[in-house]
A protein has these predicted regions:
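Mature-chain termini and adjacent capping regions
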Residues: 1-154
């Protein structure tokens, strides 16, 4: 079988499993939209694996990576609860902030994001490099750990 046919089958199965092109979360009923080179579903565990040129949009937020795993609360629930990503992480609010790093963890219900490993957070012309950042998406508060070689431009 060719690669595009297998990719089509994986996406079709995902759509059947999660009942639509987006996955809704219980909090504010935001829709997770995604694209990737490949997708694999483990229905028995409620886990979706995406790889290659992965892009997820959740409300105003964008996550790009090489590998991404989305977990539901249970096999009977289409709502994604946890997102974990690795390989060339990029996170943005589509306004004024973006961050790059090695690994990302997002709790969709709590609207919390953690990025770690060679993190580069930028806002405007300012760049803060750190080992880890934690972002509260509700209050838009960012906590930094292990800051190094950073600058803030007014």
């Amino acid at each position: 079988m060719n690669k595009s046919f297998l990719s089509f089958i994986n996406i079709f199965l995902f759509l059947l499993l999660f009942h639509g092109a987006g996955i809704s979360s219980e909090v504010k009923r935001e829709v997770l939209r995604f694209s990737s080179d490949t997708a694999q579903i483990k229905k028995s565990d409620g886990i979706l694996h995406l790889s290659g040129e992965v892009k997820i949009t959740y409300g105003q937020y964008v996550i790009r990576s090489g590998l991404l795993m989305a977990k539901t609360n249970s096999i009977n629930s289409p709502e994604v609860k946890i997102i974990e990503a690795s390989k060339n992480i990029y996170f943005s609010n589509n306004k004024d902030i973006s961050a790059k790093g090695d690994k990302l963890f997002m709790d969709v219900d709590k609207k919390f994001v953690s990025i770690e490993g060679n993190v580069e957070f930028s806002q405007g012309k300012s760049i803060i490099r750190a080992e880890k950042i934690n972002v509260d998406l509700v209050t838009e508060t960012v906590d930094f750990e292990g800051i190094k070689d950073s600058f803030i431009k007014n």
